[in-house]
Amino acid sequence: MSLLQFSGLFVVWLLCTLFIATLTWFEFRRVRFNFNVFFSLLFLLTFFFGFPLTSVLVFRFDVGVAPPEILLQALLSAGCFYAVYYVTYKTRLRKRVADVPRRPLFTMNRVETNLTWMILMGIALVSVGIFFMHNGFLLFRLNSYSQIFSSEVSGVALKRFFYFFIPAMLVVYFLRQDSKAWLFFLVSTVAFGLLTYMIVGGTRANIIIAFAIFLFIGIIRGWISLWMLAAAGVLGIVGMFWLALKRYGMNVSGDEAFYTFLYLTRDTFSPWENLALLLQNYDNIDFQGLAPIVRDFYVFIPSWLWPGRPSMVLNSANYFTWEVLNNHSGLAISPTLIGSLVVMGGALFIPLGAIVVGLIIKWFDWLYELGNRETNRYKAAILHSFCFGAIFNMIVLAREGLDSFVSRVVFFIVVFGACLMIAKLLYWLFESAGLIHKRTKSSLRTQVEG
């Protein structure tokens, strides 16, 4: 890449970044937080944060990248995607009408809410316990990170339930919403994330998500400022780099350490070059249609229920890894959101996907606002826990693609909804057995005086 070509790419990158950052800033000033703000920051991180890192790798370490015209296409496709997404998100689908009291779909009380978070936490802890009994601490047993996807590891399906510890702790926080509950959320979820990091053998997702939710709650409540958020972001990047070194068993120093930091940070937070690689091989892609979305559900079907279930699932990430990169190491390489759309239907699917994503984020913001307006604090805690708990799925959406997001968000909704139903059933059983006693003002006063 020549200096002139880099200059042209830099101008396009700067314009796209300023365009998205400006719209995000105005939205932040208006509402302080919603899921449009979160997705916009996540989109910036995924598709634009990596460009400066790539530039340093090219000019400092002479690393080969896709041709400049392909990199330009990647930047422009990301910018155009966001423009279509933003217009879709801001388009009102129906006229605003005065709030009319409606019969709520469901309601929650104190016992049901506490039972819900206990069940969610129980699912996570039991899953971790069973996985640990089968495999021990994989971080200290395996020689390479790719081995966690091999037949040596049993009970891999249990990992999908680990994440429900975070929604459980979110319910606990939203029931109190003070600084002590906020700090307890951080300590408990990060400690759990570190535990799963050692047990699973290097998976950092639970740590990243817990830290991100902690920061956004702090921004919403005004407990941290923007400069503190930026400082925490830098600390998070350094922390993820250190965990990556431990995961891959790397011991580096000097120029090698700087080089390793650049490419690991780019691959962790901003795999935008993967989109460029897909565009570079555009003519060789056999468009998969909506099949990757259907195939991604295969991993949630146990083999005893479907004996003939394919052992290798050809979703967009695996198609990109196996067919485009010809990589059969056992790791699935993230195609990014736009890359998954390219795999499914080429350039035509990019604006269509942007419209779909705009509607998805609009739905999450509708739920979030519903929780903000809810007068029943127990129901509000459940709604907010569901919304913030889905942040992991939004990260999957930006990094892994639409197909991975759909299967995971459906799984999340089913498990979360099942926990709600079980909690309500248990409450009904306890109440029928006479084990539930309603609190009265007189009994509370007696407890206080005693």
Swiss-Prot record:
**A single BP term in Gene Ontology:** enterobacterial common antigen biosynthetic process
Pathway the protein acts in: Bacterial outer membrane biogenesis; enterobacterial common antigen biosynthesis
Question: Could you tell me the keywords of this UniProt record?
Answer: Cell inner membrane, Cell membrane, Membrane, Transmembrane, Transmembrane helix
- A GO cellular-component term linked to this record: plasma membrane
Query: Where are the annotated coiled coils located?
Result: none
Topology within the bilayer: Multi-pass membrane protein
Q: Which InterPro entries match?
A: WzyE
- Superkingdom of the source species: Bacteria
Q: Where in the cell is it found?
A: Cell inner membrane
Transmembrane feature ranges: 6-26, 37-57, 63-83, 119-139, 155-175, 181-201, 207-227, 228-248, 341-361, 378-398, 410-430
Q: Hey, what's the signal peptide range on this chain?
A: none
Q: Say what the protein does.
A: Probably involved in the polymerization of enterobacterial common antigen (ECA) trisaccharide repeat units.
Q: Give the family from UniProt.
A: Belongs to the WzyE family.
Q: What binding partners and quaternary form does the record give? A: Probably part of a complex composed of WzxE, WzyE and WzzE.
Listed name of the protein: Probable ECA polymerase
The organism of origin for this protein = Shigella dysenteriae serotype 1 (strain Sd197)
**Its encoding gene is what?**
wzyE
